[in-house]
Regions:
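N-terminal organellar transit peptides
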Residues: 1-76, 83-188
Length: 188
């Protein structure tokens, strides 16, 4: 990904997903040829998250971004699992993905908008999202939990059950190694 003469830049993003925070992040990232993005979020707007993922996918195609999961990814942040095409690097501090039924934050729309049509569009979007979750490796039971309006957490020690390949990096004898992520083993 990098040559010895290319300097990498690291950016920490641990904010909610809104147009101003995402635009600021993208503007910062475009200032550097190679970015290590340490990402954590409480969630936010789905459409804004999809804009960010489109941006990250374009950079990933060029090989000039690494997305590190740090702390947790909630709500709209889970779209990294379903829509981001690059590898996801896992920090030792990553704890969980938090899923719930997606919504369009319809309280932001004026009441003159046909609420039945908005609900129909949302339900259609949600079905597409559930199909993507199935591809990622969530079980039917897990998806049904989300569909019924309940919360679902996938903790760091459960990431190995998903079909997504997660990567971790480790320094060994002063050499940076990239290897598949092994979830921690939690004794109960």
């Amino acid at each position: 990904m990098t040559s010895k003469d290319t300097l990498e830049h690291s950016i920490i993003f641990n904010q909610e997903i809104y147009p101003d925070t995402v635009q600021e992040l993208m503007d910062r990232m475009t200032q550097y040829p190679i970015v290590n993005l340490y990402f954590s979020t409480d969630g936010g707007e789905l459409d804004t998250m999809l804009v960010l993922i489109d941006f990250l996918n374009r950079r990933a195609e060029q090989g000039n971004v690494r997305v590190y999961l740090s702390s947790y990814c909630s709500s709209a942040g889970t779209l990294l699992l379903t829509d981001y095409n690059g590898p996801l690097y896992v920090q030792p501090t990553f704890r969980f993905f938090y899923f719930h039924v997606p919504d369009f934050m319809s309280y932001k729309f004026r009441k003159v908008v046909n609420e039945d049509r908005l609900r129909d569009l949302l339900l259609a979007y949600n079905e597409t999202y559930y199909e993507k979750l199935k591809v990622v490796g969530l079980t039917r039971k897990q998806i049904d939990t989300i569909r019924k309006g309940h919360e679902l957490y996938i903790f760091a020690d459960e990431l190995g059950k998903l079909k997504t390949t997660f990567i971790t990096d480790e320094f060994e004898d002063r050499t940076l190694l990239y290897k598949p992520y092994d979830p921690p083993i939690i004794k109960k």
